[in-house]
Amino acid sequence: LHITKKLPEFTSPKFIVSVDKQFRHAVECNHTATHLLNLSLRSTLGNHIQQKGSRVSDKNLRFDFSHFEKIEKNTLDKIEDNINDLIEKEIGLEVQTDVPTKKALKMGAIGIFGEKYGDKVRTVKFGESYELCGGTHVNNSKELWRFKIINETAIASGIRRIEAITNYSLKEYYNHKLKEFDSINHLLNNPVDVVETIKNLKDQSNKLKK
């Protein structure tokens, strides 16, 4: 059900309402990913993690949360791996509507700190992820395909931000990286070990600079 605050000026003609299915599905994937990210952050870094904001689009997602220090690469990899494990487990969506807010919180549902909720709320559950949420989601975690963290940074004292992609944008990202790799491989005359070749070239360059 969609509710609009403003009707067209002329309501007598017929209107065709359509949904961009891929756009909507991409948004659903990224929204569900914020829930799985929240769960993974709490399980990896600790229960001090609190959501401070988020933005979801068809292209990507960003998630702001309380944390006191920069997250190291190996920890980010662990968070990412945890989410991809949840995706591979094919966890189904469970939604409950008109749940008394106090009851939902008592049952362990997580809300946004400082957010004011009504007497009744909608809850969204993916396995151990259980949140108060009114947004649109995928029916199963497998629809995300994969999850990739693109950036992690500080946006204020004690607040970090993670930017990530899933599904359609991630496929485009991988295709772009594969083309880049092919170009590098071609420039280096198709070596057996590309990484080792680049390291050797870097060492030679450093020696020449001396």
State where each predicted segment sits:
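A glycine- and charged-residue-rich anion-binding loop/surface
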Residues: L1-K210
